[in-house]
């Protein structure tokens, strides 16, 4: 037998019970308890002011709680469960979709088998899971575990307080970890991976930027991979130069792409350039000195040739006067000379000679006499 107690209360169905003003219970063993409470469906139960349970075995417990669907359960003030076996537990918790589950104040689960566990947790998408205060999972099979953890994208996973994963199969594991891009992997505390397939490889405080970039050490920033090229148009701007202060050094790289700065820079090169220029001037001066020395040596050779050209045999006793000419050569230098001889008497001969070098014009001469008996 049905039982209705309260002004305008209505109970319809074997074993149904409606208790409260305008309470309504419809269906076998349905139960509505509370002002304007409504239970519709066999074994349904609505308990609380304006609570509503619709569907076989559905249950709404709490003021303005709403459960819609077979075995749907909404427990808590303004809790809402919609879908077969949907379960919303907590003030203003909302579960939408078959087997969805929202537990915690204002937790929201939307999608088949979606699970939001924790205050303000939000899970949206089939098999999505958000576990932790203010955790958010958006996308099929996405998962966020930890306070303020966020996973957005199919198969994305964020594990750890404030961890964030954005992109299909992106994975951020660690406190403060961030993964952005398809298959990006940030797998340590405060690690950051940006780009498709970027991977911090388990190193803490590491940052990998660019498709396929992979860290090799903690506290490292890795940009791209072995096929990556780099461009920074602003590096040549006047503003960039103006932003620099103090000594500047050159950037160096080893075979693994590890960057550092040299112990020297443009100022050192400028100083070295000055030293090289000074050395060049010194070398030029040395070469000039060498040239002068070479000329002096050649002049000496020419002097030897002049000396040779200044010699001549003595005239015979029968001759009164004689003139001779001679070509002299010494180590490649040449001279031409002439000599005049005069016999004063049978025993005395006077002579004079003059010779000229053919390259440098060196002149040599002499006078002399011969006494014979």
Predicted regions and their residues:
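Extended, small-residue-rich solenoid/repeat segments and analogous flexible loops
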Residues: 1-4, 17, 101
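Small/polar residue-rich beta-strand/coil "junction" motifs that cap repeat-based extracellular fibers
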Residues: 9-15, 21, 26-28, 35-43, ...
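Alpha-helical heptad-repeat coiled-coil segments that mediate oligomerization/polymerization in large
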Residues: 18, 32, 60, 74, ...
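Beta-stranded membrane pore/translocator domains
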Residues: 255, 263, 269-373
